[in-house]
């Protein structure tokens, strides 16, 4: 959605987008508010299949021993990632694999330096164009090594690696019936079962 700004009462000075974003989060619990390339975006509450797909992704990561306290990484949901594209820019990936010392990388507005992120993952919703386009550039510019997209609309899993200034150099697309291997740099050898993830993310009717 378009950028949102507000004026200070009695002045012509615009409020920082961060202040607007924080107020929106207070008023809309459960909604995801982000600032990407200077644009404020608001994603609605996730549905059940979105959460089911996310759980299905997490299970093999946890089964591989990630985030068990003995590894160098943690698997986390919904933490803020500071973006270099603007002074207030940040994103909130659905899932992240971060260095175990991520607390040492806390920056402003409860976000974390992208240097501690090994992987980010988005499960698409109605804002799938943001995940498939704008966030590709945003995460690449932040030099996040791996970006995974669960595209529920088209029933595919995208694995993007090798970030460049305008996007990722490698972009692999996997369909149901295939395994989507993740780079060992995340901390373990893990492949995602695309069929299981796509079925989990489909409407339950």
What are these model-predicted stretches?
Residues 1-119, 123-142, 146-205:
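Gly/Pro/Ser/Thr-rich low-complexity, intrinsically disordered segments predominantly at protein N-termini
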């Amino acid at each position: 959605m378009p950028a949102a700004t507000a004026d200070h009462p009695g002045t012509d000075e615009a409020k920082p987008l961060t202040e607007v974003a924080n107020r929106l989060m207070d008023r809309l619990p459960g909604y995801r508010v982000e600032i990407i390339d200077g644009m404020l975006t608001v994603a609605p509450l996730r549905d059940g299949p979105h959460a089911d797909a996310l759980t299905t992704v997490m299970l093999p990561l946890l089964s591989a021993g990630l985030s068990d306290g003995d590894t160098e990484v943690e698997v986390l949901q919904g933490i803020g990632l500071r973006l270099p594209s603007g002074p207030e820019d940040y994103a909130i990936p659905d899932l992240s694999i971060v260095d175990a010392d991520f607390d040492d990388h806390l920056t402003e507005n409860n976000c974390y330096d992208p240097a501690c992120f090994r992987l980010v993952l988005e499960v698409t919703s109605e804002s799938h164009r943001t995940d498939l386009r704008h966030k590709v550039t945003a995460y690449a510019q932040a030099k996040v090594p791996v970006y995974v997209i669960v595209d529920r609309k088209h029933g595919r899993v995208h694995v993007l690696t090798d970030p460049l200034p305008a996007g990722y150099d490698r972009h692999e697309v996997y369909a149901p019936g295939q395994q989507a291997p993740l780079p060992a740099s995340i901390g373990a050898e893990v492949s995602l079962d695309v069929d299981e993830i796509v079925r989990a993310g489909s409407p339950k009717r």
